[in-house]
Regions:
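Charged, amphipathic alpha-helical segments
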Residues: 1-12
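Acidic, low-complexity, intrinsically disordered interaction modules
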Residues: 18-79
Length: 80
């Protein structure tokens, strides 16, 4: 996955009023981790990811942390 692909996924989710799920590798952990970003935070989180991760989406301070997937979701907790 590239920064361009990540940006496209985030912008499509924003247009469709969906939330975003980002899948990452974490050091010392055999399985991946999923982070959910709500639609209201999409622009802010995308800006953070673009600043904090390199062109191949490895974390700038720890390359063992890597974004490997992102996709739009409809995340509902109840209430507002």
């Amino acid at each position: 996955m590239t920064k361009r692909q990540l940006t496209n996924i985030f912008m499509e989710a924003k247009r469709n009023k969906c939330d975003i799920c980002v899948e990452l590798t974490i050091p010392g952990q055999d399985d991946t981790e999923f982070i959910i970003n709500k639609n209201k935070s999409i622009e802010n989180k995308l800006e953070y990811y673009l600043k904090t991760y390199d062109s191949k989406l490895g974390h700038c301070r720890n390359n063992d942390i890597r974004i490997i997937n992102a996709f739009a979701i409809d995340f509902y907790l109840g209430g507002d």
